[in-house]
A protein has these predicted regions:
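Active-site histidine-anchored catalytic micro-motif
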Residues: 1-242
Length: 244
């Protein structure tokens, strides 16, 4: 099995020095080396850097670069892709990629961590291992593995993932419907009827773009709340093409 590992930065791609966390170009290589030294595995890894940014700072150019790299993956060469990504916007990126890159015939996982790899509380290694084991077990689709504060590691369908909660930094899926659980070194598929089956996930859908993917920054998202006075809102039509 050959896996392409794409690093984008984030906490999982960072290191802490003198109490300050910053991107570390060696983080991905260290994570893969730690995995390879811990398990006599059949998996081979190719590592590539797409970006080196904390995920709360991502913009449209970041998404365009990552999506276009995924669309260009040699699916004859690789059995799967693992994207290392920050947790702050993990739900946004994984869901967007799942929708735009739905024509890919190979599975794509998004792996993040709450602390840098060398921190004793980091979940980088277990989340990465869960992603590899999911691929080895024949798991399909766009997925996100994450170990929560209760010690349980779930494999989420990317399009059902919610943002991490503010109390424990745990990740959940809508309705708690997950693809699988990673337990005792093994993947246990849930076969939840509320989610697409592994067979359905293995069938690529028609692509939504024929050329380079471009993400418009001219869409405004309004989050309503009780008492919001819409009459006070002023939107310059020249700069906006849609309002959600």
């Amino acid at each position: 099995m050959k896996i392409l590992v794409l690093s984008t930065g984030g906490t999982i791609g960072s290191a802490t020095k003198d109490g300050v966390m910053s991107p570390d170009k060696n983080a991905t290589a260290l994570l893969v080396l730690l995995y390879e030294s811990s398990f006599q595995d059949v998996a081979e890894f190719d590592c590539e850097s797409v970006s080196d940014i904390l995920s709360e700072n991502v913009t449209e150019p970041f998404y365009e670069k990552l999506i276009n790299r995924l669309l260009a993956v040699d699916t004859e060469k690789y059995d799967g892709v693992i994207v290392l990504h920050g947790t702050d916007t993990l739900a946004y990126t994984s869901s967007l990629a799942a929708m735009v890159c739905r024509s890919l015939p190979i599975p794509v996982g998004f792996v993040g961590a709450n602390y840098p790899l060398k921190h004793p509380k980091s979940k980088a290694f277990v989340n990465f291992r869960a992603a590899v084991e999911y691929l080895k077990a024949g798991g399909r689709g766009f997925f996100v593995p994450y170990e929560n504060s209760d010690g349980k590691t779930y494999i989420h369908l990317a399009t059902r993932l919610t943002e991490a909660d503010f109390l424990h930094d745990d990740f959940h899926s809508l309705g708690d419907a997950v693809l699988a659980e990673f337990k005792d070194g093994k993947i246990i598929f849930s076969n939840d009827s509320r989610l697409p089956s592994q067979e359905e996930l293995s069938k690529p859908l028609s692509g939504i773009t024929d050329g380079e993917f471009e993400l418009s920054g001219r869409v405004v998202l309004l989050k309503s709340y009780p008492g919001l006075d819409y009459s006070e809102l002023r939107i310059k039509h020249d700069n906006v093409c849609a309002v959600v």
